[in-house]
Amino acid sequence: MNNNTTAPTYTLRGLQLIGWRDMQHALDYLFADGQLKQGTLVAINAEKMLTIEDNAEVRELINAAEFKYADGISVVRSVRKKYPQAQVSRVAGADLWEELMARAGKEGTPVFLVGGKPEVLAQTEAKLRNQWNVNIVGSQDGYFKPEQRQALFERIHASGAQIVTVAMGSPKQEIIMRDCRLVHPDALYMGVGGTYDVFTGHVKRAPKIWQTLGLEWLYRLLSQPSRIKRQLRLLRYLRWHYTGNL
């Protein structure tokens, strides 16, 4: 078996993470032997690690997801510290989503999009079709009422979607994915947060050099000073890291 179709797992504070070496490893793993895996993809960064610690419902949601991967550089560094031989790299959720969409377009995999503002969702659909000829079999913006959820799940099931991406922020998107899987289990689900906004140019992502240096968090802070409280909260994670409480 090709080594890229399997991946080791690592545990941080009780949370089991998949250790992908790079983006190609992630894609080969998810499309092992030409078959797209089924389950839920969840990106893990330091902020989400803190939320998991503090919120039992979120912890249960995240633990239930099959594919938890290191989206944040802090998490990658913690894995490498705890497991010095680990060959694990950051796989940014926004980049993984684009690669999945490109692969879906190439193979004709049916995709259902959930979340985002109506105009952003429409632009996302148009760009995906134009750029990669993605077979989008349905979509729903993020502005639906609780009583409309079941009808949405039935639509997703009827569409035959094999990839469902949900852009509603955490933990809303994890709740939606969990509940939708009860109706439509035969798909790969991915929570993508604000990815549609970035993809369509409504939100500017950090330049590549900032990402490479692991300073995307600093770029966002400089761009949005209001994030300072969120960033200060991460000092708790740094304490875990530097005291080895992982």
Swiss-Prot record:
Q: Which GO terms describe its biological process?
A: enterobacterial common antigen biosynthetic process
Reactions the enzyme catalyzes: UDP-N-acetyl-alpha-D-mannosaminouronate + N-acetyl-alpha-D-glucosaminyl-di-trans,octa-cis-undecaprenyl diphosphate = beta-D-ManNAcA-(1->4)-alpha-D-GlcNAc-di-trans,octa-cis-undecaprenyl diphosphate + UDP + H(+)
User: What does the UniProt keyword field contain?
Assistant: Glycosyltransferase, Transferase
Pathway given for this chain reads: Bacterial outer membrane biogenesis; enterobacterial common antigen biosynthesis
Database matches in NCBIfam families? PRK03692.1, wecG_tagA_cpsF
Family, as annotated:
Belongs to the glycosyltransferase 26 family.
This protein is called UDP-N-acetyl-D-mannosaminuronic acid transferase
